[in-house]
């Protein structure tokens, strides 16, 4: 049921308090659809409902459904290998074991997966980098869009689901915020959020039985990214400010192949194109991946992204080529129709000429620390999807594991929340804007946003050094001070909220990177090129201003 305003902002009927889900992508919709049969749910989107990052996912979703050629053990092994020693094996196994059921659930919802009558479950399975078997269910090359449209239609039709567009959460409301005296004597709990109704320019106080963060990653902290404008790390930043730990924030995955074109700098060229035989070449036609990894184009993303970055810098290139012309026109149009159409609209016929590609920030492998039910350190607060650290991705995410994680953990979170009793709610104060005024110059926000994204790209990118990281941290702290001062004196806007969150996440990324004195997975340091025999996740704790479980850091 679509709506422009929550039906229960502060209700006298506490037994009917809704569950508030912040984010309307696959993670949020999975939780909502699994819970809505038993209780009311609000799903909040800060832009239009169709603008979630899920809709941008091309490749597919992992499913161990081919029992003849594939197995859970094989999927787990591939996940462990890609994750470079930091994957929690029990997490990887749990999610792999649930993968077939996740695919079945999507089929039951009506997702029109590309079919193959001879394939397991009647599905055409493709293969992507890092996978030893064909196990990727897909909808041509627009899997995320198809899944998102189906689930969004289901949510729109459900009487117990209220969908909000153009609402953005500012901060979580916890009992420690309500009464500072209880901070040391009473466990902290989340009771709701302050959220900006963007269309009406008004901040509301929203009570909730539980809050679920399904806000996605932080790709917009970088100048070049495959992510939509929604990827500003809102959930990670809010959870951190509320007292939750975050893990492995240094591991930002750069997708190896985003289209290089002046008119379209965020269009991703799916991993599946290399999985089906696409070749990486220098502009002179020379292949180069064999010099970097024996798996060539099928190496994990971190290796391929670094290889492309190395070759671009070595030869002074703006891009390299991804050549799929040898696959044939019919094959390309059947398996990659969206990529073909987008490139044709830009004057590039990929059946006859190679695609110019560059790496771009793509996926946040760390985030809010949760268990396998999505529970965070804060009672009443859950997190699901790219905003989280569950241990699945380790130091590098295996292709197409992300959509799977959203469904498996989302389903588990829904079950756990459904078992909870509605808490005794305190009186939540209204948002106070009596001491602030309308912003005088938006150029401050625009300038600081541009500066942040540039310094993160130049100093905290694919290859890092301590000097670059320290410069970045120094500048980020200055920007945070400026933005916090602005936040305290002027009325909030979406751009201000997002910039505040991006700066919070940028500092977490840099601090985590400085703590990792080795090169592993997505984190490559020229100062520490070696890899330890044993390593641990980087866990930052708000109260301790950052700690690591690694005794060598």
Please report, for each region that a protein language model flagged, where it lies by residue.
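Glycine- and aromatic-enriched mobile tails/lids
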Residues: 2-9, 14-18, 34, 40, ...
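N-terminal Rossmann-like FAD-binding beta1-loop-alpha1 element of flavoenzymes
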Residues: 19-43
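An anion/pyrophosphate-binding glycine-rich loop and adjacent beta-alpha core
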Residues: 238, 244-355, 416-423
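Short hydrophobic core segments
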Residues: 20-22, 206-215
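Conserved N-terminal glycine-rich FAD pyrophosphate-binding loop of Rossmann-like flavoproteins
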Residues: 47-78, 84, 253, 264-267
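Glycine-rich loop(s) and the adjacent beta-strand/alpha-helix scaffold that form part
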Residues: 210-267, 314, 401-412
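Conserved redox-cofactor binding core of oxidoreductases
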Residues: 107-202, 214, 258-261
